[in-house]
Amino acid sequence: MEKTNRKKLFDEDIDYVNEDHISSFAKALAWEEQYEILENEKSGASSDKESQDAATIQKETEELDDLGADELSTALNGMHKPDLISSKSDWWPINTSKSIPKTKIRKKSKKSSVNEGHSKITNEFRSSASYTMLRWPILIFISCWISLLCFMYIIVRAYVALSEYFLTWVGKRKELRNKLRASQNYEEWVQNALELDRFLNLDKWSENPKFSYYDSKTVELTISKLASLREEGRDNDLMVILQGCIKKNFAGIENRQLYSHRYYGTKYLVEKYIDEVIVCIDKVIESQQISFNDKRRFFRTVSKNYGKTALCLSGGACFTYTHFGIVKALLDNDLLPSIISGTSGGGLIAALSCTRTDDELKKLLVPELARKITACEDPWYVWIPRWWRTGARFDSLEWARKANFFTRGSTTFYESFKRTGRRLNISTVPSNPHSPVILCNNITSPNCIIWSSLLASSAVPGILNPVVLLMKDLKTDRVVPFSLGSKWRDGSLRTDIPIDALNTYYNVNFSIVSQVNPHISLFFFAPKGTVGRPVAIPRRKTHKEKYASLRGGFIATALEQLFKLEITKWLQMIKSLDLLPHLLEQDWSNIWLQRFSGSITIWPRNRLKDFWYILSDPTEERLAEMLSKGERAMFPRILFVKHRLSIEKAIEKGRKQTKLSANFNTLTSSDSGRTELSPEAAELQVEPAMFDDDEYDSDSSDDEVLSPNNKKHIDKFGTPNTEDGDDDEDAYEYYDDDDYGLSTEDEANQENTGNSQGEENDTGSRFLKSFFRAGSRDSKLHRRNTVF
């Protein structure tokens, strides 16, 4: 009776599993797991021998096609290894059939496989006598010292937490905070946040435009100039000014500190600037004074300058189900980015988000989705013998079948992009520690099947064995191995958050990172507050308009930074000297020393009891709790994301309306079609040759470059053209993120950029100020002041 009354999940009864594809996956895994291919004889085989081997392989393939996936392990004895796609590099594949004599194939045991893995990782630097004698004493000493540092770090953090709990969060202030944390939706959260701001007198902070972390004077001048040009109808000059101010972190307006002094809101001047820029962009779109080609060049230019926004979902075992709430909060507010990356468990949520439309996704992000999350359902008496036999707790074939629901069957990255317009990115790492990492997406691997990359990204040593990627062969419509020389495993071992790769492929300059890794969350500490969560300052100080303070005071913050940097230093030494043993054929030193943060980093709160369920499937009640926890963690960042995406969407609107269709690609701009500019604007105008119409544009030509019939398709493995802002020196994102993680790079980029405004902001300020001073034609303005 209970089952008949339960709410039905969208698409719950649809079986997306293609058993033929699962069988092909099983064949590739069985060959790789049971046999090793020794070195081939240098002398080539005769043509008669090759044809005989080809006939044998064809016969064996026909026999295997009649077997199920579970019968393959006993049917492969004495057969030839199937052809794989090998490569010299990521972009140079060679599909060759190698005839391998049966005498060169031998059975491979699990223990020998492990030993061989260790021998592959061992390098010549470990062979010296001094290394052999001193390695373990040094490692033991460093480990003891790190343990002591961690203990002292925990003491400092406990002191800060207790002082805030007993001395700051008391009385009505505590009641208002508890009310804020209990908000059920975003609208309710905003009202509660504003009430808390008013009680703490934080709303008055927004009224004063001056702040050391951005250039308020430049922002004021920009607003004034844009408004006057728009009202006077000087659309051409307006377009030139917009070219200079629409770019990443212009005048420091994307500094996190601007959103870290209130629970909801920022400086009113910043909000006014964003509103004015959007109005001016719409003015350029509707303008009759500006030619079509000039509009098109303008929007291509500002799109490169401003960049794209991406959502990055980290790994973290079953903590990753909190990402569902992050995605739901963004989707409900129409702020879900079109570029989403995921690693390990985060890849599952990313795949669901990119293979479904908005309407479908809203129907799936409900507690009933827990019925489809059954990866850990095997009892202990099933998985313990499996782990003892195979070295992995979970079965790859079962996970492949269960992942099909989240990927809509054997959907490829290109098919997902064509269906929803979202660009899915899954980070995978070769099982060989010295091979390059690959970010699977619609550019690098458009025909790769998503569920195979999900399994590869989830293949943590001891949890799931490395797997082979699969791709669709467009000529035969079959599934074939997509192997670039090795199997693939969990991407979080090396690149949990692939920000640099996203910038390379998609010009991503702004990243929203949802980080749930428990070994990283412990070290999250925002000494100056974070977005939507200001430092807990006593009310007596806020009423005196003293809004800046450090968590726990200067001494506590200094000790926290000292201990964290010391831990990072010694971990880096372990990695540099290669002291850590390679357990399970993997170098584990990278899991602490990556970049784990982004422009905005969300850290959902994990409770101690959550660790009990770290490798278990959620019930509907627990998934509902995780959805709510993820939403509440995202609410404080919604305003920041909204401000960023509002300009990005306005630019995209202009690009869509001015984009040339495929039938008009032969059109070129002529001098006669140029618009008239004022003398000062003419000095700053971009030369047409700088952005030629024939230049590759990642947004406008995705369909052409990634089409299955295109000559640059992945089957041909032509190197993709990434000229759309990818070769720009300043294209990479280095936001100051001293609050997050243990990365040395994160600690090096402190938030003191607010005082100096950085080289980029200075350039933008010089450009605008020089333009404003150009009242007379005698003032000479140079193109080098224009920032692109």
Swiss-Prot record:
Residues 311-503 form the PNPLA domain. Pfam families: DUF3336, Patatin. One of its GO terms (molecular function) is triacylglycerol lipase activity. Residues 690-705, 723-749 have a biased composition (Acidic residues). It is found in: Membrane. Its main location: membrane. It is a single-pass membrane protein. InterPro entries: Acyl_Trfase/lysoPLipase (IPR016035), NTE (IPR050301), PNPLA_dom (IPR002641), Triacylglycerol_lipase_N (IPR021771). Gene3D superfamilies: Cytosolic phospholipase A2 catalytic domain (3.40.1090.10). GO terms for biological process: lipid catabolic process; triglyceride metabolic process. Belongs to the PLPL family. This is Patatin-like phospholipase domain-containing protein DEHA2B04136g.
